[in-house]
Amino acid sequence: MVVAPYLAVAIGGSLGAMSRYLVTIMAQNAWGIKFPYGTLLVNTLGSFLAGFFLIVLVGRFSAEESFRLFLFTGFLGAFTTFSSFAAESLFMFEQGYWFKLITNILVNNVGSLSMVFIGTLVAKYVLLGHQGSN
């Protein structure tokens, strides 16, 4: 059995989970707990990073398999959180917070999809944009 892929996922996952916790705490300190800003922030930021690194590391530089596992499956998989998003949405539903619920669902989904797209555009600009001016 090859240990390297499992170790890459474990280390990336540990760092991603710790980063998610820190971002969530910082968001709660900045904006309070009336809306799950921390979850929204990690999901949209993680989506941007996924789009960016998909182009840079996979498309352009063909990163090693173990590094892709570390970053995408490990770090970004643990940094972003669909389960927290779902649990927070269920809480809003059960409490009858309809506006917050709809806002949470729309902003997380549309925001995350948009950020993946924007991440790919930024990566393409960084990689190709400067070549066009030479």
UniProtKB/Swiss-Prot annotation:
Lipid bilayer topology:
Multi-pass membrane protein
Q: What is the lineage of its organism?
A: Bacteria, Pseudomonadati, Pseudomonadota, Gammaproteobacteria, Legionellales
Known regulation of its activity is:
Na(+) is not transported, but it plays an essential structural role and its presence is essential for fluoride channel function.
Against PANTHER family, the record matches this protein to: FLUORIDE EXPORT PROTEIN 1-RELATED (PTHR28259:SF1)
Cellular location of this protein?
A: Cell inner membrane
Q: Output this protein's name.
A: Fluoride-specific ion channel FluC
Molecular-function GO terms, alphabetical = fluoride channel activity; metal ion binding
Superkingdom of source: Bacteria
A GO cellular component annotation here is: plasma membrane
In the record, biological process GO terms are: cellular detoxification of fluoride
- A Pfam family annotated for this UniProt entry: CRCB
* Principal localisation: membrane
* Physiological role: Fluoride-specific ion channel. Important for reducing fluoride concentration in the cell, thus reducing its toxicity.
Q: Which reaction does it catalyse?
A: fluoride(in) = fluoride(out)
* Organism of derivation: Legionella pneumophila (strain Corby)
- UniProt keyword terms in alphabetical order: Cell inner membrane, Cell membrane, Ion channel, Ion transport, Membrane, Metal-binding, Sodium, Transmembrane, Transmembrane helix, Transport
The record's similarity note reads: Belongs to the fluoride channel Fluc/FEX (TC 1.A.43) family.
Entry binding sites for Na(+): 77, 80
- Residues crossing the lipid bilayer are 7-27, 38-58, 69-89, 110-130
